[in-house]
From Swiss-Prot:
Keywords: Glycosyltransferase, Lipopolysaccharide biosynthesis, Transferase. It catalyses: N-acetyl-alpha-D-glucosaminyl-di-trans,octa-cis-undecaprenyl diphosphate + UDP-alpha-D-galactose = beta-D-Gal-(1->4)-alpha-D-GlcNAc-di-trans,octa-cis-undecaprenyl diphosphate + UDP + H(+). Coiled coil: none annotated. Disulfide bonds: none annotated. This is UDP-Gal:alpha-D-GlcNAc-diphosphoundecaprenol beta-1,4-galactosyltransferase. Its EC number is 2.4.1.304.
Amino acid sequence: MIDNLIKRTPEINRLLENKRVTGVVTFVNPYSYYKIKEYNKISQLDYIYIDGILLLKLFNFVNGTKIKRHSFDYSSIAKTVFNYSIQNKMKIGLIGSKDYEIEQAVKNIRKKHPGIDISYFHSGYFSSLEEKSSVIDSVIKKSDIIICGLGTPAQEELALDIKIKSNEHLIFTCGGFFTQTASRADFYYPWIKRYNLMWLQRIVLYKHVRKRFFIDYPKFIVRFISENLMKIFTRSN
């Protein structure tokens, strides 16, 4: 199911051509691909993009597709989504990261996008189910576009909880975007984006990314290739 969802997800500009588009938009990389594939609510997700050059190249090779990379950050679609919200006078709600990180991220986003209407924001931590429910009710009431950054699968779970209560919102997951944007308004250096080396900058800065890159990613490569040997063999013949 995950591969079909990826294949039928339109590029972001095409998706946003529909001013009334709603649903949950999420992203997969070598770390999260199998987490989402085995997620028991995957059928409730509406759009899945590939974030990560490694997975992108493997996926396109195995499936004979020409899918492009999409990620919710300033190397990819974040600017597009924020500008879309400004042009269409839509309110933005943000949920994720720690209190001080989301507050600083909001400041940096507002500085980078004059005119943006961030009408609600909250950390990704909830003291109780009652608080989580209250946050969901508030972000639904105050926002048109909602962006959740809690890591996989917590962010997908939150996005679907929001969707269950309201099917009138466009909901994106964004991974570590708020944490990154709290440190720099445009987290990735220009030359990093130019050469698609976002993974390298994250490896240098974050210990958990180094673990994923050197331990989890090799496991992913072996599993992905072994599970798709028949497709690879068929394509080569």
